[in-house]
């Protein structure tokens, strides 16, 4: 409906450039918003180039707005009994090979099980994991990070929660921003 307020907080557009063929359509739909904030400066720059009728600002990602103590309130009880490391990757199957190699080496040295958290609806198991969680709820996601002994991640949010929960971690990326 046209008579409702539309607000986007800390949105991410997930691209370096907006394709020319999509600019008009994106502008049409975003112009219906009363307020838009994004979490990447590059996204702010791209959206400002569309000359929207509203101001676009960069704000802090919501994962960084709460303390560890507050996030703990939303986590479930411990879900994995033995000591473990989280393997949370948003990469492709081929890119996961490097991440898996690193995870196996660290898990062996630290004597940890490898617990995989799978991104989105993807159900492809990353080879080398001992236990897997698919389509996790926020409470499960938080619990897995809260109780992990080590984290290997490939995303901003994996890194943010590793820091927030004061975990030893390794972030491996494919060079995306």
Question: Model-found features: residue ranges?
Answer:
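Active-site anion-handling motifs in enzyme catalytic cores
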Residues: 1-177
């Amino acid at each position: 409906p046209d008579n409702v307020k539309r607000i986007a907080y800390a949105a991410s557009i997930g691209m370096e450039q907006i394709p020319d063929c999509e600019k008009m359509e994106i502008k049409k739909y975003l112009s219906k918003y009363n307020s838009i904030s994004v979490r990447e400066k590059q996204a702010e720059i791209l959206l400002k180039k569309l000359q929207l009728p509203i101001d676009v600002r960069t704000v802090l990602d919501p994962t960084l707005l709460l303390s560890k103590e507050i996030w703990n309130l939303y986590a479930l009880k411990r879900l994995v009994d033995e000591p473990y490391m989280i393997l949370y990757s948003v990469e492709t199957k081929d890119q996961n090979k490097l991440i898996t190699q690193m995870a196996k080496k660290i898990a062996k040295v630290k004597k940890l099980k490898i617990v995989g958290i799978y991104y989105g609806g993807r159900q492809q198991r990353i080879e080398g994991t001992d236990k897997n969680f698919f389509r996790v709820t926020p409470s499960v996601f938080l619990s897995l990070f809260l109780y992990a002994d080590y984290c290997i991640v490939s995303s901003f949010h994996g890194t943010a929660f590793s820091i927030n929960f004061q975990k030893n971690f390794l972030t491996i990326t494919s060079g995306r921003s």
